[in-house]
């Protein structure tokens, strides 16, 4: 995930908040890995003669099942992040919230099958 030069913005915060939200809404830990540095694309026939560059902003992280950060990477250094989770506790937390209690896949399962639609 990088900052798009055309948009002149830094999407790191938005990306991180979205991923933390996925962790919290599904009550599962999320590990988000990203690379660092500038990558350039030189013009060639395969890319239609376009030249571009994208700066990857690192910021890899690990969030627990509530979305809280438990490991945090930097923007410009290669790193290995680790975290340990008590999976029984994670499961207990997920069950106590009842997040999936009201799911009714038998009502919508047909539209999730390959080649099917609404």
Language-model segments: residues:
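CN hydrolase (nitrilase-like) catalytic-core segments centered on the catalytic cysteine
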Residues: 1-81
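A sequence-level detector of short, solvent-exposed, charge-rich linear segments
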Residues: 38, 42, 49, 85-89, ...
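A short, polar/charged loop-to-alpha-helix boundary motif
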Residues: 77-95
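Cysteine/selenocysteine-centered motifs that mediate thiol-based redox chemistry or coordinate metal-sulfur cofactors
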Residues: 90-118
């Amino acid at each position: 995930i990088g900052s798009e030069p055309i948009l002149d913005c830094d999407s790191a915060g938005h990306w991180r908040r979205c991923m933390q939200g996925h962790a919290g809404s599904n009550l599962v830990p999320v590990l988000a890995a990203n690379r660092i540095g500038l990558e350039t694309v030189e013009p060639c026939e395969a890319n239609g003669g376009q030249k571009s560059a994208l700066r990857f902003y690192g910021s890899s992280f690990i969030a627990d099942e509530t979305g809280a950060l438990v490991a945090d990477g930097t923007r410009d250094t290669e790193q290995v992040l680790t975290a340990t989770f008590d999976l029984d506790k994670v499961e207990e937390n997920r069950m106590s919230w009842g997040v999936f209690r009201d799911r009714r896949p038998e009502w919508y399962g047909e539209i999730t099958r390959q080649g099917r639609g609404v």
